[in-house]
A protein has these predicted regions:
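Non-catalytic interaction-recognition regions
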Residues: 1-91
């Protein structure tokens, strides 16, 4: 249970870093900072998805985890858009 919460909070923290990463990348003229961030975000999402079941969770937990998935998807799509990369809708 602690591991699940750690994965959830790690993903939330990574999502929250996005505005700072954009500012840093722009200030330093370093678009590779955004590629690193998108990779780290994908890793955080993978750990979350691997350790936090959604389908079999109770209704409240399921709803919050689905909202976190949507936040990660939106964040990754926005970062990729800044890099002029089109994010796939389905994998």
């Amino acid at each position: 249970d602690v591991y699940k919460r750690q994965a959830e909070f790690a993903l939330i923290r990574k999502i929250a870093e996005m505005p700072e990463m954009i500012n840093t990348a722009a200030k330093d003229y370093d678009p590779s900072a955004l590629t690193r961030y998108s990779y780290e975000l994908a890793q955080a999402f993978h750990k979350f998805y691997d350790s936090c079941p959604i389908k079999d969770a109770d209704a409240d937990v399921k709803q919050s985890r689905l909202a976190l998935c949507e936040a990660a998807r939106t964040t990754l799509r926005n970062v990729l858009s800044l890099l002029k990369v089109e994010a796939p809708e389905r994998m």
